[in-house]
A protein has these predicted regions:
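Glycine-rich, anion-gripping cofactor-binding loops and their flanking helix/strand elements
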Residues: 13-109, 206-207
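Conformationally flexible catalytic loops at phosphate/diphosphate-handling active centers
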Residues: 1-5
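Terminal amphipathic helices with adjacent charged low-complexity linkers/tails
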Residues: 96-147
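Active-site diphosphate/adenylate-binding microenvironment
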Residues: 152-207
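Generic structural signal for well-ordered, non-membrane alpha-helical segments
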Residues: 17-25, 63, 78-82, 142, ...
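Structural motif
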Residues: 8-10, 72, 191
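Extended, charge-rich low-complexity interaction segments
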Residues: 63-83, 129-164
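A structural signal for short coil/turn segments at secondary-structure junctions
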Residues: 6, 32, 92, 184-188
Length: 207
């Protein structure tokens, strides 16, 4: 990372059964103005910081250039859907913090600088996610990024070539995934159960 990258970081949110954990990941990304790479089952995939097609972006030259400008990485939940995210978690040039609500956490390469139990953050039941995110960021001396940081990630995603849709059957399947995802997003909507690894990867790519 460059010398001026102190306030630049990335939040990765993987699978979790806890809505509070997903909400905290999203709140951290919004508080710090960092890009949010959130898997569909992270319960964090929403808001202005969440990026679509992030796994594709990380595998491109512009994506690698953006990662090289980052200084911090926060990992929440259990990310496991893409090789490009796994490679990101294994980088030696990032200060990596893992937030975990379970006994086992994702740090396969052993690169995490610190592991913090989410339930050990000293939060009161009356706290909202924004308050918890603020206290956590302060405790880790994390600095809010300049607005250009997140915007650079959004532009890079927007500049990705349109995904190939090789046949009508594939196009129909993609459209169906998008419709189901949108129907499951509102508060109070029925729980969406995704039944196979290929299905959730398609959802991760399209939704």
């Amino acid at each position: 990372p460059s010398a001026d990258a102190q306030g630049r970081g990335i939040v990765v949110a993987g699978d979790t059964a806890s809505p509070a954990v997903g909400t905290l990941a999203r709140a951290l990304a919004e508080h710090l103005d960092w890009p949010l790479l959130a898997e569909p089952t992270s319960q964090a995939r929403g808001g202005p910081q969440a990026l679509t097609r992030y796994a594709e972006l990380l595998a491109t030259g512009p994506g690698r250039d953006l990662v090289a400008q980052a200084d911090h990485l926060i990992v929440v939940g259990h990310p496991s859907l893409s090789r490009s995210v796994t490679a990101l978690l294994g980088r030696e040039d990032l200060d990596i913090t893992v937030l975990t609500e379970r006994a086992g956490w994702t740090d396969v390469p052993g690169r995490a600088r610190r592991v913090i139990p989410v339930d050990g953050l000293g939060a009161r039941m009356t706290d909202d996610a924004a308050s918890r995110a603020t206290r956590l960021a302060d405790s880790l001396t994390l600095v809010r990024a300049d607005a250009a940081w997140a915007e650079a990630w959004r532009r890079a995603v927007a500049d990705l070539p349109e995904p190939e849709r090789p046949g009508s059957t594939d196009a129909v399947a993609n459209a169906a995934v998008e419709v189901v995802w949108e129907a499951a997003r509102p508060v109070g909507a029925p729980i969406l159960l995704v039944g196979s690894s290929m299905t959730v990867r398609r959802l991760d790519r399209l939704a």
